[in-house]
From Swiss-Prot:
Top-level taxonomy: Archaea, Methanobacteriati, Methanobacteriota, Methanomada group, Methanobacteria
Gene: comA
Organism: Methanothermobacter thermautotrophicus (strain ATCC 29096 / DSM 1053 / JCM 10044 / NBRC 100330 / Delta H)
Described function: Catalyzes the addition of sulfite to phosphoenolpyruvate (PEP) to yield (2R)-phospho-3-sulfolactate (PSL).
Presence of keyword Lyase: yes
GO biological process annotation, one example: coenzyme M biosynthetic process
Keywords, sorted A to Z: Coenzyme M biosynthesis, Lyase
Keyword check for Lyase: yes
The protein's Enzyme Commission number: 4.4.1.19
Pfam families the UniProt entry points to: ComA
Molecular function terms from GO: phosphosulfolactate synthase activity
Family listed: Belongs to the phosphosulfolactate synthase family.
Protein name: Phosphosulfolactate synthase
């Protein structure tokens, strides 16, 4: 039983179909990662090993962390940039084999940096699904100049293509900063016209909005509801985000209904 549980609005337990929280692991040690799970695993659904961090760590350490996360009912997966590097080097089959041997059951397929045409990306999603992986795809470009070339209708088309190819959910690119990328302006504010265009046309239960900033998290929760799917959450902000979801923080107190 949690402290003050009589003051805590209930929320759906895991495995959740909505209200997903994805957290970014940029290289935590096993002890720190376990401490994090001990205090906050109930509020985390996915944890992403950021970009290309995994090749810098020992295989036994990576496997230990993968197994540990899963023991807390948290699904770990490698960041999409690592997949793009594998594709660039014509090592996709080897990438799948290594991911499986390390214990990963979920992969991210993206084309945010490496040029992978939509048709090829969809083929790779299908390939990963056929290999037995759950796939999270990502839509958007890492380079703000390239990302700005995507109109809202382009994002809708790309999301739909990924879902048809077999992606379970689609991440909307915002990078670690949440600024000057995707639906965010240079200050991290949401471009509301673009946001509304996407929410009117896409299934919200299949979208994970990357929202590293607190103001962005509050916006999504007030606009879509506490069961909105949010990603790229810093590890130290897991509990804070959960309080926002439940109306246990001034930003949403009395404004959310679970």
């Amino acid at each position: 039983m949690n402290a003050f549980d009589f003051l805590t609005p209930p929320r759906s337990g895991k495995p959740r179909k909505n209200g997903i929280t994805m957290v970014l692991d940029k290289g935590m040690g096993p002890a720190s990662a376990r401490d994090l799970m001990e205090i906050s695993s109930d509020y985390v659904d996915f944890i992403k090993f950021g970009w290309g961090t995994l090749p810098l760590h020992r295989r036994d350490t990576v496997k230990e962390k993968v197994d540990m996360y899963r023991s807390f009912d948290v699904e770990p997966y490698p960041g999409g940039t690592l997949f793009e590097i594998a594709h660039l080097n014509d090592k996709v089959e080897e990438y799948f084999q290594e991911a499986r041997s390390l214990g990963f059951e979920t992969l991210e397929i993206s084309n945010g940096t490496v040029e992978i045409e939509t048709e090829e990306k969809c083929r790779l999603i299908e390939m990963a699904v056929d290999e037995g992986f759950m796939v999270l795809s990502e839509v958007g470009k890492k380079d703000p100049e390239r990302d700005r070339l995507l109109e809202p209708d382009d994002r809708v088309r790309l999301v739909r293509a990924d879902l048809r190819a077999g992606a379970s959910m689609v991440l909307m690119e915002a990078r670690e900063s949440g600024q000057n990328i995707g639906i965010y302006d240079e200050r991290g504010n949401i471009r509301e016209d673009e946001f509304n265009h996407l929410t009117d046309r896409l299934p919200m239960d299949r979208i994970i909005w990357e929202a590293p900033q607190k103001s962005q998290q509050v916006y999504f929760i007030l606009k879509i509801g506490p069961d909105v799917n949010l990603g790229n959450i810093p590890p130290e902000e897991i509990t804070a985000l959960e309080t926002i979801r439940r109306g246990l923080r001034g930003d949403t107190l009395g404004k959310v209904n679970l």
